[in-house]
Each structure stands twice: as structure tokens, then as C-alpha cells.
């Protein structure tokens, strides 16, 4: 059973006639147009994430050729790289080359790649050194994830899904409500259970 709570940022553009809407990202903690950011950025909106069923950062990597995520054999960790630059996934003493920022908080462990994107508002991948804004652990780039904020009205969302190949049942619940003029709370939970694709390696008692 895999449970997660989550994450991300992005306003997507749409081509209409020959014009494109301005793409706004919050990768550096403020609203900025992609045209004004002096770095290479790939941004994924909430609509894009839902349309292509991006469940986690590994799925995001399949839609961005510069992003590479390599799991350890044990599955407990991962090495995240951008443009071919990445640190070892198993060496704790080595700082990662790519920072992962979720809602403005730095996550030092690449295990966060397991977190779900089911309540993500935007995911942005900034390529190239970003130490000026994000510190030393961003020599290759940064992945920022922004989750949805609480709204001005009560919101309740319930979803259920089933995937036949691995017999996976997914249940999602989201509740959001304001508690004052300036404060609100949002809770997002997801449970996934698969009957196939998981190997149980049970050792006999010694």
C-alpha cells in the first residue's frame, strides 16, 4: 500500500490563432513569466499532470528528456540528475546535484520522488546552476513542486480508480476550507494498493 500527500506549480499556455498565452511559474517563490526567467525552465500545469496521469516525479522525467531519475536496487533511494549531472543515490556524505523543493521547503532525500502529484498545482524543472536562489545543492538544477492552496469556499473531492494490468485500486480524498479571512486548511490523501507487480521475498525462520 502506498500512501502520499502532495505537491507542484504551473500555468500552461495554449495556442490560439498564432498567439500564445503568457506562461507564469512560481519556481523562484514569486510569480514570474517564463520569458523573464534567465534560465531554462520546463513547467507542468495541473491540467497537464491530470491529462497525462503523472503520478510522481519519475513520470515527470518521462516527459522531460533532460531529467533523469535512477533508483537504487533496494528501491529505497534514487539519484536525480539534470543534463547528465547527478550525485550518487547511496552516498549520504555527498550533497545532491539537484534540489527538490516542495511548497518552498527543501527535501534533502531523493526518496521524495515517491510522493504523489495528485494535488499538485504545478511542477517546474529549472536546468543549470541555481545556487543563487536555492543554495549549494543545486549545481545541476532544481525541481519545484507547488500544491494547491486552500480556496475561499469549502471544497470536497473524492475519486476512485482501478488499473487492470497490475490490479491497482486508487482512492483519493481532498477537503479544503477557509477558517478565517486570511487562513485556510487543505488536506489531501491518497491510497494505492496493487495485487500484482509486487514481489514478496519471505525468508524462512532460521
Residues of each region from the PLM?
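Cleavable N-terminal targeting peptides that direct proteins into the secretory/outer-membrane pathway or into
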Residues: 1-19
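Short, acidic, small-residue-rich periplasmic hinge/interaction motif at the N-terminus
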Residues: 17-50
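Envelope-exposed proteins and targeting segments
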Residues: 19-21, 37-40, 63-65, 76-78, ...
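Extracytoplasmic beta-strand/coil segments of soluble accessory domains associated
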Residues: 26, 58, 62-103
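Residue-level signature of outer-membrane beta-barrel architecture
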Residues: 27, 102-104, 147, 177
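Non-catalytic regulatory/gating segments with a bias toward low-complexity or hydrophobic composition
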Residues: 41, 49, 60-61, 123-128, ...
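Short acidic/polar hinge/loop motifs at secondary-structure boundaries
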Residues: 90-91, 97-98, 103-129
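Outer-membrane beta-barrel translocator/receptor signature
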Residues: 97, 109, 118-121, 131-206
Amino acid at each position: 500500500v502506498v500512501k502520499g500527500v502532495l505537491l507542484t506549480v504551473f500555468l500552461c499556455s495554449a495556442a490560439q490563432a498564432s498567439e500564445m498565452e503568457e506562461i507564469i511559474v512560481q519556481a523562484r517563490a514569486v510569480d514570474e513569466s517564463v520569458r523573464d526567467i534567465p534560465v531554462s525552465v520546463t513547467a507542468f500545469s495541473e491540467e497537464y499532470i491530470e491529462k497525462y496521469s503523472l503520478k510522481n516525479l519519475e513520470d515527470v522525467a518521462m516527459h522531460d528528456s533532460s531529467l533523469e531519475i535512477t533508483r537504487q536496487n533496494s528501491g529505497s533511494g534514487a539519484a536525480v540528475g539534470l543534463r547528465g549531472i547527478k550525485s550518487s543515490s547511496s552516498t549520504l556524505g555527498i550533497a545532491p546535484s539537484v534540489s527538490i523543493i516542495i511548497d518552498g521547503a527543501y527535501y534533502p532525500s531523493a526518496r521524495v520522488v515517491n510522493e504523489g502529484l495528485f494535488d499538485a498545482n504545478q511542477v517546474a524543472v529549472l536546468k543549470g546552476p541555481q545556487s543563487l536562489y536555492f543554495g549549494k545543492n543545486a549545481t545541476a538544477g532544481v525541481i519545484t513542486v507547488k500544491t494547491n492552496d486552500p480556496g475561499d469556499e469549502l471544497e470536497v473531492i473524492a475519486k476512485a480508480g482501478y488499473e487492470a494490468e497490475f490490479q491497482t485500486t486508487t482512492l483519493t480524498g481532498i477537503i479544503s476550507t477557509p477558517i478565517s479571512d486570511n487562513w485556510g486548511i487543505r488536506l489531501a490523501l491518497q491510497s494505492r494498493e496493487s495485487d500484482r507487480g509486487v514481489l514478496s521475498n519471505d525468508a524462512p525462520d532460521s
